[in-house]
């Protein structure tokens, strides 16, 4: 199977090239030229597989230039019980709210306690194999812009992996204290972390600009290096996310929560659009999904887009209690638009150019109609998020983080608006302990909060009785290794300096 750019369909590459390169030279994103089709027999066979078996099937269908042995190696190295605390790295949890069942897909049992581990534990292995196939002898320089979770997960996945170097940029005031400490204490001889003065969109724009500046790429090439990305613009990041939607469906059927062949809804807290896009791609393969429910916080650019067909990033930016969704430019939406406009690269390029130059574009009526047919967009503010965490904990003792609470709240809005009783999978993207202050304020509103986030973790543990994940429990005593801060427009110079090129 080959891949082409969303902005130049003539730019065709293999899977290994797409993963190694990360982004197309024209600035477009790589997408599969077709989708494998999973019929009833295929899905029934996957019911009998464990998570690794399901992953191997999906990877083998998309990565046709990888051998079965190579895929086995990647999957076996990534999804170990030691890293994820059990044989199933993405277990279902069943709870209730308002007397109604909630089926929660918990994606935060990995080494950094966030859903990004599901992709970033395997991406470095896919990347090193891709480099051997396409760019023998070159080292990959992985640039990451993060709103919180991606940075730590990418650092952890890439640390000390041969022939890779990783540089992570995060907004200086746009991540939680826990996330900042996780990144700045990162171990590994091939890792660099730097804060930027600005928000996530500034960081992401800076990384994209570095990727698409030929002079910088030439300097790397002269030093036997090339750029790649661990953000969800990289196909190697997006592909592993398809797996857990298929696995969730199989687990729901096996657990008696869904009849085989019946449709389910998916509810995804959404920032950069990669996670919900993976569910859409799973549906393109034949997974029976009825509705894609896109949950946003106060930065509700996606809600407005789904409801109006107009994408407009020219609006106030809010710093919220769900910082991984504090995003106004959702990069992976480009892939959806390319699919919905009939794989028309010229139209996609026109919209993306309008976004870059004026911060706004409007899709055609036909695309708008398809989006409103398949997607539901809703948002909630910090007060609603807090209330949802509180209600869920009071009713069933289930503790969730702020991003998951946004998804639950928007799902309630959806059910109220539509009356749809289709079983839904709520995607839970982070451990509540990663956002202990906001969660504590919800479940123990009258308690005096301790000064440090680590003391808040201890207090949340006492209030909830939920065990503190081991990776977070051991973080308190780690010393920070990184403290650099740079201007957004100085990012190119910082990268070259960090690599020892200038």
Question: Regions from the language model: what does each represent?
Answer:
Residues 1-502:
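PLP-dependent amino-acid enzyme catalytic core
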């Amino acid at each position: 199977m080959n891949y082409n750019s969303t902005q130049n369909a003539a730019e065709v590459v293999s899977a290994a090239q797409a993963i190694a390169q990360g982004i197309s030279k024209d600035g477009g994103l790589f997408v599969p030229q077709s989708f494998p089709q999973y019929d009833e027999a295929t899905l029934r066979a996957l019911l009998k597989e464990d998570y690794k078996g399901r992953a191997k099937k999906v990877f083998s269908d998309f990565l046709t230039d990888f051998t079965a042995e190579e895929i086995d190696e990647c999957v076996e190295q990534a999804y170990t019980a030691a890293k994820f605390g059990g044989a199933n790295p993405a277990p279902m949890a069943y709870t209730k709210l308002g007397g109604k069942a909630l089926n929660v897909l918990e994606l935060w049992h990995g080494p950094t306690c966030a859903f990004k581990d599901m992709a970033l534990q395997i991406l470095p292995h896919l990347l090193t194999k891709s480099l051997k196939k396409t760019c023998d002898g070159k080292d990959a320089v992985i640039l990451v812009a993060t709103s919180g979770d991606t940075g730590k997960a990418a650092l952890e996945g890439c640390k000390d992996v041969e022939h890779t170097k990783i540089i992570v940029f995060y907004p200086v005031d746009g991540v939680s204290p826990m996330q900042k400490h996780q990144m700045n204490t990162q171990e590994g001889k091939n890792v660099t972390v730097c804060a930027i003065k600005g928000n996530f969109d500034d960081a992401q724009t800076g990384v994209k600009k570095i990727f698409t500046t030929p002079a910088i790429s030439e300097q790397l090439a002269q030093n036997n290096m090339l750029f790649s990305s661990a953000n969800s613009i990289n196909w190697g990041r997006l592909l592993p996310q398809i797996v857990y939607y298929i696995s969730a469906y199989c687990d729901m059927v096996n657990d008696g929560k869904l009849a085989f062949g019946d449709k389910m809804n998916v509810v995804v807290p959404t920032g950069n659009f990669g996670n919900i896009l993976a569910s859409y791609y799973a549906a393109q393969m034949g997974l029976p999904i009825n509705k894609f429910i896109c949950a946003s916080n106060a930065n509700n650019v996606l809600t407005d887009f789904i409801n109006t067909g107009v994408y407009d990033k020219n609006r106030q930016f809010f710093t919220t209690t769900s910082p991984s969704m504090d995003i106004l430019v959702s990069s992976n939406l480009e892939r959806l638009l390319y699919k919905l406009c009939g794989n028309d690269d010229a139209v996609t390029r026109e919209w993306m150019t309008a976004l870059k130059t004026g911060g706004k574009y409007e899709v055609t009526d036909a695309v708008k109609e398809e989006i409103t047919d398949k997607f539901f967009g809703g948002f909630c503010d910090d007060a609603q998020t807090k209330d949802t965490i509180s209600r869920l904990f009071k009713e069933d003792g289930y503790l969730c983080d702020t991003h998951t609470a946004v998804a639950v709240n928007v799902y309630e809005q959806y059910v109220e608006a539509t009356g749809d009783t289709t079983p839904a999978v709520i995607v839970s993207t982070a451990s509540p302990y990663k956002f202990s202050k906001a969660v504590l304020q919800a479940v123990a509103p009258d308690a005096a909060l301790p000064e440090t986030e680590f003391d808040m973790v201890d207090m949340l543990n006492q209030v909830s009785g939920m065990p503190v994940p081991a990776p977070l429990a051991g973080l308190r005593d780690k010393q920070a290794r990184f403290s650099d801060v740079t201007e957004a427009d100085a990012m190119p110079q910082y990268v070259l300096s960090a690599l020892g090129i200038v």
